[in-house]
Each structure stands twice: as structure tokens, then as C-alpha cells.
Amino acid sequence: MDSDFEPKTLSDIPPERRPSIGEALLPILGVVVFLGVGSGYLGLAPHAPLLWSIVFAGLVGLVRLELTYADLYDAVSNGLIMGLQALLILFTIYALIATWVSAGTIPGLMYYGLGILTPEIFLPITALLAAVVAFSIGSSWTTAGTLGVAFIGIGSGLGIPAPMTAGAILSGAYAGDKQSPLSDTTNLAAAVTNTDLYDHIDAMKVGTALALGLSVLVYAVLGLRAGGAIPAGQVESIRGALAGTYATTPFVFLPLVVTFGLALYGVPALPTLVTGVFAGAFTTILLQGAQFTTAWNVFLNGTSPETGVELVNGLLVTGGLSGSAWTVTVVALALSLGGLLEGIGVLAVLADELLDLVWSENSLVAGTGIAAFVTNAFSAQQYMSIVLPGVSLRNAYDEHDLDSRNLSRAVEAVGTPTGALIPWHAGAVYMSGVFGVPTLTGSIDLANLSASIGGYAPYYAFAFFSPLALFVMAATGYGFVAKSDA
């Protein structure tokens, strides 16, 4: 996304087309009702409820705000353009995962990982390793789509539930991404708030360290509880199946080395991932003995290996490029909805209403975090959650003599990690797709007055601790930097 993008503020909207707070809440209520009834009650995939939400928001724009079809079209187009890189990365990651499975890269990581790790240390090690990789390459998505997929397999072999493993991967990946000078969101947060990049990173370090440390502690406790759950001989059975199906020499890690090497060198995400696809295809041919056409059919159609062990077969089934359709269409619909809500002025009105509730520096910083989360939920992409409050609240920080690094820290502490908690958000749809684990599931038993919650969200500790650290710092004033002292 272009960091020069500036979303509408209230002053940008002509008075005759400016939504009232009631009109702004109408589309928001529609989203909540349609997703709640459609996905929560009827059990539909999110596609139809998102489409209903888009149509309803469009009707509000046409009927109540007297916008034209061209206005609505432009708003939806802007939402899709903002998320275009995310959509292209989605296509590419699905192809990359398939070629890396066929190349033996992901099976190789599983093979060696199962020989080293134990259930007791697996989850904290996963979180820390994901943090190091994401910090090094500047991408939570790439970390999850490569290292993360392999660790889901390792965790399954060790008897660790996949939602726990997914939560640990995400905690580390987003913590590392958040602090990396190579990360797109880190650079974006600094750019839209007019903050020096390294001042922004420095302002986040205490909150990130605290949130990641608490997350690792949670995973250490979960790991102790998971210990001893492996059926006798399961690890060796899995390793034997992997070694019997794939060549597991260290050379199978060539695609991984090439991809991470390019990322460390600063090559943009898309060409890096495309190169990883080519490296995976050629490793499949050279090391696994596949025909040229077979390797490139995997790129399109995915893998369905027969290893002789059902658990391993299930872990290594991939959809390839064609398997990305479900995920990409959800993300495209969510981006369209987010662009429409921004374009008709709904998000600008909500941001302005937030400012009316600010009475101190402490409430401003806490309110910024809340604004980032609300924007994440209704725009369905983390870029908007950083850009909208980052641009809209700059003057408020000046008026309260707060340096811009306070603003950049607040929008990223909440905006970057929390998207993957929201089931229809682009980040959550992506992570759920690559891990094969739902973001959030739930059921209510009215007869017994009980409820259950599943998916990876309850185990994604960093997404809870990062905002919590920000709110504690906001309440105490810790880490505030006055503009006059900067």
C-alpha cells in the first residue's frame, strides 16, 4: 500500500453528504447482524454475509447520503487497491506452500524438528523462533506461510493441538514483524504519523517485550500440560513415513534459504515469494525426482501425498494456486466492505466521535488503540487500522503536546496484531487458510447454560497482551514523550 494514501476525515466530506452518527452506525449494525446471523447462527461461510453487508452499506450511501453509484464504485475500488498486495501474496503463498511440500522442504522441517523438540518446550520455542524470523525478514505472513506451516505439522506429531501451535506462531510472528525495520506496517505507522522510523521502533520496544514475554510464559505453561500426550511410537512412525516418501537431505532447505536470504537482503515480498515458488519447483525436480510437468502441476493443483501414515497425509495435503480461491474471495469481499465504509464516511464519523470522548493525554492514547481495533474490525485490513487513526488523530496529539511516536506506537500496538483475531479480517482469513485452523468457533448450550470457544484465537496470546500493555502504559503515562521534549 502507498503510505501517501490519506483516508477521508470529517472535514473532507461535504456537509450535505456527511453521515450523522445514526447513519454511520446503520452499516456497522448491518455488518454485526449479517455476520452474526449468517455465520454465527446459520453456519454460512462469511462470503454471503459480507456481500449482504456491502449491499446494505451501499444502499445507505445511495438512499440516506445521496451518493452516486460512481462514488460507491470508487470506494470499493480503493479498498481493493489498498489490499491488492495482500491478495497477490495470498495467491503466491498457496502456490509456495504446495511447491515446498513437494520439494521436501516442509516435510524436512517436520522430520528434523520432530527429532529435536519435545512437547514441553515446543510452544515457547515456536513463539521465539517465529519472532526471530519475522523480525529478520519483516513479514508475519511469510513467516506463518513457511515456517508456520511446518511447525503445525511438528506440533501435531508431538501431540500439541493445532490451535495452540497456530497461536504460538502468530504471537511470535506479529511480535517480530512489529519491531522489524523491514516490516511494511512498521514503516507505514511511522510514515503516516510523521515519525522517525527508529524513534517509532524504540517507542514500541517495552510494550512488545512485555507482551511477548507474557505470551511465552503462557506457552511454557501450556507446554507442560501438553507433555506426555504422545502415543507410543508416534514420532518415529511419522519420521519414518516422511523419510520414506521424501529425500530429507539438508539440500531440501534450498528454497527456504533462497527465500529468507532475499527477504533479508531487502527484496520486496512478492518477488521474494515468487522466487521461492521457482526454487521449490526446481528442488522438486532435482531432489525428489519429479517430472517437470509434475512439479508445475503441483504449483496449480497442490499435493496429496500417500506416505502410509494417515496423520502425515492430512498434514501435507495442499491446494496450490487453485486452492486459494476460498480465502482470496473472502478477503476481496472484506476489502470491498472496508473501502465502502471508508468511502461513504462511516469510519471518519466514528473517529470524530471518539475525539469527543478524549479528555486527557491518557484517554487519547487509550482511545487511539480502541480506534485502531474498531477500524481493523470494520475495514478488515490492518493497513487501514494504522492509516485512519494515524492520520485523523495527528492534530489531537499536537494539541495535547504529545510527540508523534506516542501515536505511532498506539496504532501499531493494536492495529498490527489484532486483525488475525477477527474472523472476516484479511489477516485472519489468511492465517486460518494456511494453518488449516479456524480463527474462532463457538457454541452455546442453552439447556445446560454453557458455552465453548475454539479456534486459534484463544491461544493467540500476543494479540491480547500487546493492547493490554498499551492500555496499562496509557493509564500510567509510562513512556509518554512530550512534543516539547522530543
What are these regions (language model features)?
Residues 1-26, 70, 228-243, 295-310, ...:
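Intrinsically disordered, low-complexity non-transmembrane regions of multi-pass membrane transporters
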Residues 81-86, 111-128, 156-165, 245-253, ...:
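Membrane-interfacial loop-to-helix junctions in multi-pass transporters
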Residues 120-133, 159-175, 363-376, 400-428, ...:
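Alpha-helical transmembrane segments of multi-pass membrane proteins
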Residues 90-93, 119-150, 334, 347-350, ...:
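Hydrophobic alpha-helical transmembrane segments of multi-pass integral membrane proteins
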Residues 44-47, 51, 71-107, 120, ...:
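Core transmembrane alpha-helical segments of multi-pass membrane transporters/permeases
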Residues 16-20, 39-51, 77-81, 113-118, ...:
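Interfacial loop-to-helix junctions that mark the boundaries of transmembrane helices
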Residues 22-34, 44-65, 87-93, 124, ...:
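Hydrophobic mid-bilayer segments of alpha-helices in multi-pass membrane transport proteins
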Residues 2, 178-181, 189-241, 385, ...:
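Juxtamembrane and boundary regions of transmembrane helices in multi-pass small-molecule transporters
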